[in-house]
Amino acid sequence: MATGTPAAELRELTEEELVSRLRESKEELFNLRFQMATGQLDNNRRLRVVRHEIARIYTVMRERELGLATGPAGKGDAA
């Protein structure tokens, strides 16, 4: 899969799911960099896609922190 997750899809996730996605993406980026260093990386574009996905996750988290966007509908609005 050479495409990242759209921001709209990330905005539907809860905070815990975003943190989990972030951890997974960072792990993948680490592994891709390791493969690149050892000359085993076949798809260089995947590095860029994963970096952009990490940036999207951070952006969604920051939007919520600043109050520019809310979490998924129905979660936390009732309290």
Swiss-Prot record:
InterPro entries: Ribosomal_protein_uL29 (IPR050063), Ribosomal_uL29 (IPR001854), Ribosomal_uL29_CS (IPR018254), Ribosomal_uL29_sf (IPR036049). GO terms for biological process: translation. One of its GO terms (molecular function) is structural constituent of ribosome. Keywords: Ribonucleoprotein, Ribosomal protein. PROSITE patterns: RIBOSOMAL_L29 (PS00579). GO terms for cellular component: cytosolic large ribosomal subunit. The keyword Ribonucleoprotein applies. NCBIfam families: L29. This is Large ribosomal subunit protein uL29.
